[in-house]
């Protein structure tokens, strides 16, 4: 960030917007060190932000200010980043870390609801790829599904399935994946 400011007199989001990069659909990763102006630019340009909590934690990069990005109108998604900065590409783990890091950073146990977190990982992820036909359970949407075994000890008790998905589910709980109605794994 500092190098971009020194070279171009602007933060990376402002500089890239001025170059026209955000005139096409864009997803920006991490976005840990945004200014208010950066958030305004990203929101105005409709840039999605992929939060990568495990990568940010491993590299000591900081915690993305989800609250400020949401307030600015930025649509958030979830990412795992690459193998150099996250050795475990486990979306369940990253979803869990995103929830915990935001709650710890905000000192607020309800800063992101389980339902909101699931939307970040599913619906918003699909939208960031231009896929309006998936990422949600709705008549007419593609049947892209992941089914989990909820009879494991760590998934009990089931008071709220959304909470269990965020705070208890593991990749090993997946018993079925389906893409556009075709079962790929069972």
Give names to the regions the model predicted.
Residues 53-57, 82-84:
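Short, acidic/turn-prone active-site loops that include or flank metal/cofactor-
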Residues 31-35, 55, 132:
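Short beta->alpha connector loops
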Residues 1-48, 60-76:
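Histidine/acidic residue-rich metal-binding segments in metalloenzymes
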Residues 18-21, 25, 67-152, 160, ...:
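His/Asp/Glu-enriched, well-ordered alpha-helical/loop segment
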Residues 177:
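Short aromatic-centered micro-motifs
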Residues 58-63, 87-89:
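Short, charged, surface-exposed secondary-structure boundary motifs
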